[in-house]
Amino acid sequence: MSITPADLSPASSSDHREKLQELLTAVRDLHDTALQELQAKIAKLKKERCLDAQKLSEFHSKNQHLREQQKIQQEKIRQLEDRLRSGPCDRCTVKEKQIKKTNTELEDNNQRNLSVISELEAERKTLTDENRRLSLELERLRRSGSPQNTSSEAEEGMIPDSPLRPLSLPVASKMKRRKEQNHVRYTETPLSLSHPESRQREQSVAFGCNGKGVLVAETCEMDATSVAERDNKRHFRIVVPETCRPDVYPEQVDDVDDDDLHIPSHTEQNQKPELRDCTNILIAGQNDDSPLILRCRPLASQDHQSSIDDVLRTPANSSTCVLTKGKRKHSNGAKKDREISDCRLDADETDIKGIIFASTPANGRLQSKNQETSEIETTQDSKKKCLDGHTPRKSLVQNHHAPFPYDQSWSVDPGADLGQYDTESSPQPEHQARTDLETLDTDCTFVSHSLLLRGQKTTGQSQTTGIGQKANDSLADIFDKTGYGEYESCPQDDSIDLKQDSVYEEEREEDDPEEKPEAAVVFRRPADRKPLVSDSDKSSRNKSFACVEVVRKKDERRKLKGHYCKECEVYYADLPEEEREKKLTSCSRHRYRYIPPSTPENFWEVGFPSTQTCVERGYIKEDEQPDVRIRRRRPYLAMFSPKAKSQKKKH
């Protein structure tokens, strides 16, 4: 830009000065404003710095104070550690010493108490032993002083020729046994018995009974034989209570009146468990024409001891030793107050029981010439030879090791209750007589119809033995029956209900198909509507079947509590507790609301169309679109049609 001289005129120069002056004033103003702003900022920063300095001083003072407190705490900790290292204080040491002293005193007292207790126990034991010894001595003195218990001394000690050792029982059990057996008396009715034997074997019996009888108590595993010969008319009898295979050697006794003989039997029921099965009363009778016959008879219970007697009935030309139970009195065959009759057992049932029941006439007298002996023998040939032989036995030495001719697997204690025994006993083989003696359960023996009726011959008349003929033999067959003329003390009830099972009936038909029933029996079951009559013909016999009727009606069933399942629990899980229990109780009866019937009406009638035709004609309506779910799901909504399933698959 070129400056012309015209421009350098004084007028133009004045203008330029004014403009420059204005610019300078403007710049000065701007500078002043900026400087003021900066000074204000500096003052503000100075104030903040002062405040920070004050805070810093405060923090420093606090820090110093905390450091001083920390030093004090560390000093205290050091002092406490020094005290712990130095040990407990004096007070603690004194307390510890006192505690140790009391503990030692308590231990010493306990030791002294234990020693005193041991001494007292030893003294008590010695006193009990002395008391037992004195009581045994007192009991022995009482028995030796009483004239009735002369044979009890032998029972307390060891019996000669007996494998059993003497057992020391407590005095309480002995006194209890004597108390229980105190009311039992055994009186023997003497009758003439021929027993020819010399007096040279009289010493074989260790405990003699004044020449009147022998009482052998609790002997086991021995042979029960007795030799009797003719041409010597002397009274001889052997009463053996609670024996199992006893061994009684022949002996010679004096010819003394036996009316005053009294031999009580004190049974020890709780002495050994092995002796509970060996409690038979063996009553031996000997005649002139037949060998010795051992007869077993189960005694009645203690409730009937005063009214039931045990009497032996012997064949012709023989005399019997009768063992009666009751008060001690003089009795003979002509003056008997009690009359006893028994159910006779047929000889055809000999393979069933092996037990001999003896019976007497109705008038109570021993009429041996007008009656025959009814005996039951076992099926074994060896046992039959011991009973069927009509010649007297040669000697005891030959038959010493022979087995007992009867099965001794069960017996009846004369002092025990008869209710725990059964009147039936199945035969046991000879080789099992010893092994089964310990393991056989003799409380109840079951004999089926086939076994009971196998050995019985077909007869035209009804034979009622009273034992083993029916599956449910009544209690009348167990007890004795006293008869006088047409009167019976324990008559048979002809109208008794026979609760026979169909299993017994089928078993009886299979095992014995040719056997005919003895009489037509009419019986009725509680559930039978009509009585069923069993005819004499087996082929036309009607079997009885129990009929069960509906007891509860529909209204009663609705009131019952229902059964619920896991699905119902899940289904009703969102309900409250009370409402859920209410729903679950009716769970088993709500399925009919959701499950449609499987078949329509008249489906099984002839001419009804098929299911597809019923669907096409509209007989069966299918719900293709079910209702909206009331809750989470409806598990019992069932769709049975395959057509609906195929349509759902297509969609």
From Swiss-Prot:
One Gene Ontology term from the biological process aspect of the record: meiotic cell cycle
Which cysteine pairs make disulfide bonds? Answer: none
**EC class of the enzyme, as a word:** hydrolase
UniProt's post-translational modification comment states: Phosphorylation at Thr-599 and Thr-611 promote interaction with nbn and recruitment to double-strand breaks (DSBs).
Metal-binding is among the record's keywords: no
Q: How does it assemble?
A: Homotetramer; formed by antiparallel association of helical extensions protruding from the N-termini of two parallel coiled-coil dimers. Interacts with the MRN complex; the interaction links DNA sensing to resection. Interacts with samhd1.
Compositionally biased tracts (Polar residues):
363-379
Q: Where is this region: Disordered?
A: 138-199, 363-433, 487-539
Q: What is the native source organism of this protein? A: Danio rerio (Zebrafish)
Q: Return the EC number.
A: 3.1.-.-
Biased composition regions of type Acidic residues, renumbered to the chain: 503-515
User: What's the protein here called?
Assistant: DNA endonuclease RBBP8
Q: Where in the cell is it found?
A: Nucleus; Chromosome
Query: Biased-composition ranges for Basic and acidic residues?
Result: 380-391, 525-539
Which residues, renumbered to this chain, carry the PTM Phosphothreonine?
A: T599, T611
**Stored Pfam families:** CtIP_N (PF10482), SAE2 (PF08573)
Q: Which GO terms describe its cellular component?
A: chromosome; nucleus
Q: Which residues form a coiled coil?
A: 35-84, 117-138
Main function: Endonuclease that cooperates with the MRE11-RAD50-NBN (MRN) complex in DNA-end resection, the first step of double-strand break (DSB) repair through the homologous recombination (HR) pathway. Functions downstream of the MRN complex and ATM, promotes ATR activation and its recruitment to DSBs in the S/G2 phase facilitating the generation of ssDNA.
Chief place of localization? nucleus
Note from the entry: Binds one Zn(2+) atom per dimer. Zn(2+)-binding is not required for homotetramerization.
Among InterPro entries, the record links this protein to: CtIP_N, Ctp1_C, RBBP8-like
Classification lineage: Eukaryota, Metazoa, Chordata, Craniata, Vertebrata
